[in-house]
C-alpha cells in the first residue's frame, strides 16, 4: 500500500501552494467552534474542505478525519485501507499576525480513533518564508521544498541533533503544575526560548536545532491542549523516527491509545536526554 501513502502526500504537496495563496482571503473569524471548542477562522474550514477534496477520492483511503470536523467521514471500503487524520491549518491564529502556520497529517492503518502504534506515516507542511514538507515513513524522515506548482524538491534526510539548543512550552505559566514549572526553570538555564504559537513551526525548530517542545497538562486542563489524533501522535511519530523521543509525561506518545476522536493529551517531543529528564520530573500527569 506504499502507493496510497505516496498519493496522500502528493495530494497534500499539490494543495500546499493553494492553501498558502488563499490565506489572505480567509483571515476572518467565524461564529462557529470546532469539535474541540476552538473558535474557527474561515481559513480553518476552507483548508479542511480543500484537503478533503484532494484526498477523499484516493484509492485505499477509507476514512478522513479533521480537527475541524465532529466525526470521521467514511470515503472508501478498500481492504487494508488507511485513515487520514489532518490538522488542516495548525497555528491558524497566526494568520492574523502573519506568522507561520502549517498542515499536519497522520496516516493510520486502522479506523479512528486509533493508537499511535497504528501510524504508518506522518508529515507536515510548513508555510514559512518557504513552503516545506517533512514526511516520516519507512523508518526515515525527509524534507522537501514545495514549489508554487506543488512540485517537490528533496532536501535530504532529517535527523534530530544530539545536542539540544532550543525549547518552547505552551500554556500560561500560572496554570503550569509546580513539577512542570520546576523542570522548565532547569531547562531555561541551558536552552534558548523559541515559541511562536504554531505547534508545527515550533516542532520544526526542534528538528533543526535539537531541544524540546511541549504543551503540558495544566492545573485548569490536566489533558493539555493538543489533540492526540491530529497533532500529538503524528508529531511524535516524526520526531521519534528522526531519532528523538516523545512523551505524555509517563510514556511515549506512540503508546497512547485515544478512545475519542478529539481527545487531548499532554505532549512533549524532542531530544532523548531532555525527554528523559522530563519523564523523571513528571511522574504522572497531575504532578
Swiss-Prot record:
Pathway: Carbohydrate biosynthesis; gluconeogenesis. GO terms for cellular component: cytoplasm. It catalyses: beta-D-fructose 1,6-bisphosphate + H2O = beta-D-fructose 6-phosphate + phosphate. Binds 2 magnesium ions per subunit. It comes from the Archaea. Mg(2+) 2 binds at residues 87, 90, 231. Belongs to the FBPase class 1 family. This is Fructose-1,6-bisphosphatase class 1. It comes from Halobacterium salinarum (strain ATCC 29341 / DSM 671 / R1). The lineage of its organism: Archaea, Methanobacteriati, Methanobacteriota, Stenosarchaea group, Halobacteria.
